[in-house]
C-alpha cells in the first residue's frame, strides 16, 4: 500500500508539471530505464544489444554506445548493474562495456554469483563473488565519472530511507559520490538472496558517512521508470542544455523502459487453499514475485496514462515479456540451459507486437527509437557548434 501511494504521489506531481508546449527534437530529454530481476537481466541485455546495433548502423559508427544518446540511464538491481556497465568509463573515457558484452558477462559470471551458499540461517548466496567481480570490472570509478546521468536506487535499512545515486545530487550531497562497485552490489542485494552491503564515504566536511544498503527494488519495486523520469525532470529544469524549457511536457521526453519479464499472464497461479498451507519463507518468495509483477504493471499503467494524456504516446516504449514460463520466471536460475532460454525469450520478444492493437513489433519500434535518438544527437551537436 505504501509503495502504491508513493507511486501515485510521484505520478500526480509529474503530471502537474506538464504543459502543452511542443519541444524541438534537439531539446528532448532521452531516458533509458532498466528493471531489476537477477539473471533475467539477460532479457533487457538482448534488447540493448539490438538497439546499440541499430544506432551504430544508423550513424555508420561501430563505436557508438548507448551512453552517447541517453541523458539519463536508470536501473534497479540487475538493471543497476547494466546501467553501470554501459556508463562507467574505461581508460579512454568510453563505456567499458558495449551492449554486446552484457550477455556473455551473465554466462561467465552468473553461475558463480548464484552459487548456493549452503547456509540455512543466512541469505541464499553469500555475495562474495558478486562483489569481487564488480570490483574487478568497475575499479575505483565513482558516480561523478559516469558518462551520462545515472539513477541507481538502493534502500538504507538503518535510516529506513531510499538512497538514489545520481550525478546531479552530488553538489548537495557529496557523500553520494560512492564507488560504482559499492552501488552495484547494494542495488542488487535482494533480501533473502544476498547480504546487505555496508560501506562508507565522506561528507563535504570530511566526516564519515555510513551506508547500510539493500536491493533498490525495495525502494522502486523493480521498475525504476518513474524514478528515472523524476531525475530527467530535474535535469530538464536545471541543465543549461535545456534552458529554453520552462516547464516539463511529456512531448519533451523520450522514454525507453526495459523489463526483465513477468509471468503475470499467469504460468504460476495460486488458490487460497494452497496458499493457506505456506510457511513464512514460501510467502516471502511468493510476495516478492507478486509484488514485482504487480508494480511493473502499475508503473507502466501510470506512465502510459500520462503520456497519452499529453498526446505523446509514441514517446514512450515499454519492452516487456508478460508470459514467462517454467525456469525463466526465476531470478536466480543461472544454469546454462535457463540462460539460453532467456536469450531466446529476448530474441523472440523483438519479433512480438508492441500491443494487441498495433502491428508494430518491438524490433520496428526500437528502430524508430534509434532513428529519433540519432537525429536528436546530430541536431544537438549541430546547435552546439554555432
From Swiss-Prot:
Major localization listed first in the record, in broad terms: other
Positions of glycan attachment: 115
Motif GXSXG in this chain: 75-79
Domain-level remarks: The nitrogen atoms of the two glycine residues in the GGXR motif define the oxyanion hole, and stabilize the oxyanion that forms during the nucleophilic attack by the catalytic serine during substrate cleavage.
Motif (DGA/G): 215-217
Coiled-coil regions listed in the entry: 321-381
Motif (GXGXXG): 36-41
UniProt-recorded Gene Ontology molecular function terms: monoacylglycerol lipase activity; nutrient reservoir activity; phospholipase activity
Family matches, as SUPFAM superfamilies: FabD/lysophospholipase-like (SSF52151)
More info: Patatin have a dual role as a somatic storage protein and as an enzyme involved in host resistance.
Full protein name: Patatin-14
GO-annotated cellular components: vacuole
Signal peptide positions (record): 1-23
EC annotation from Swiss-Prot or TrEMBL: 3.1.1.-
Species per Swiss-Prot/TrEMBL record: Solanum tuberosum
Annotated ranges, domain PNPLA: 32-229
